[in-house]
Amino acid sequence: MRVINLASGSDGNVTYIESDGKRFLCDIGLSCSETTARLSAVGISPNQIDGIIISHEHSDHIKGVDIFSSKFDLPVFAHEKVWLGLDDKLKKVKSQNRKIFDGTFEIGDMTITPFEVPHDVSCFGYSFSCKNQKISIVTDLGHVTDRII
């Protein structure tokens, strides 16, 4: 499993996750062009990305999602509670690319488990598991709960 934090903070959040040939971005809070530049800087073409996973609706997490998904025809995955706040913000994401889930799901050999995070809007962290490796990504954590630990 390979994880690269491309951006973190109030100016934008983007994390690259790769496992068994599947490549995802968790949030795209930068512009499409800036995200593309940061991917290129670490030797990754945006054409290699298989999808986008969204933690929540704030602009520092979704700023580039609409254009990036549209430009590269990528699916966008988000928990059903998160999609409620995204419908009016992600108008360029094709209907067939809107992937709504309410629990653990699998993509290839990767198992993705969402867990709710305390925040002022519906927000989720994700645990990514593949074979004997696991990593969790949590952003905008209001406070640590027993569930998160």
Give the positions of each predicted feature:
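Fold-independent oxyanion-binding glycine-rich loops
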Residues: 8-9, 28-29, 79-80, 101, ...
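Conserved beta-strand hairpin/beta-sheet module of binuclear metal-dependent hydrolase folds
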Residues: 1-42, 124-139
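Metallo-beta-lactamase
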Residues: 79-132
